[in-house]
Amino acid sequence: MCVIIIKQKNNVMSEEIAKTSSKINPHGLGIIWLDTFEVEYHKSKDYRKLLTKRPFIAHFRYATKGKVNKANTHPFICGNNKDEYLMHNGTIKGMGTDECCDSKELACHLGSINRIDWKKELEQYDSRFVSINVRTRSFQIYNRNLYTYRDGIWYSKANVLQDNLIAVYGTLKKGFGNYYS
């Protein structure tokens, strides 16, 4: 079920939290650096990239729909607008296929509607979202009440903050492994 981590301050996140995020969400890591608004895609095991004072929004993926590959690693471009990106934590019923994850399908849909209507569209789901505009260097958190804020960092799921966490959501689909493994 993924996790989105938003770190805006000059602090460094805990290595244990980054490692736990990677361990329970092993299917890809996407990062938008908030000082440059550059977008990067990595393997989840590259979590040490986040042990920095640089501000970022990161997404660790746990595949529930769609293949485990770079194409299904967040953030996703919203339709044809190369400036707008979406990160999502949750599952959207009725979206996604064996090939394409639900979040990517939703991002494509958002690109086809007026930006002013995104809030209404996203708040209808019991999920967590962040939209990022790399041109205006801004971002918006949706359903913020579902996030946990600790030590200057927002977490879309509090399970990564638990000590000695050993369980993951459900079981992996046959043939699913770590992104790029």
Question: What residues fall within each predicted segment?
Answer:
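Regulatory input/activation interfaces that engage signals or partners
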Residues: H59, T64
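Acidic loop->beta-strand submotif enriched in PP2C/PPM serine/threonine phosphatases
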Residues: K65-Y85, E121
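Extreme N-terminus nucleophile/cap motif
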Residues: M1-K49, K53-F56, L146-W154, N159-Q162
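Short beta-strand scaffold segments in enzyme catalytic cores
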Residues: C2-I6, G28-D35, H74-I77, S127-Q140
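Glycine-aromatic micro-motifs
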Residues: L161-S181
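Cytochrome P450 core scaffold surrounding the K-helix E-X-X-R motif
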Residues: G66-V68, M95-T97, G175-Y180
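Conserved beta-strand-loop-short alpha-helix elements that form
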Residues: C2, D83-G96
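Short histidine
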Residues: K93-Y149
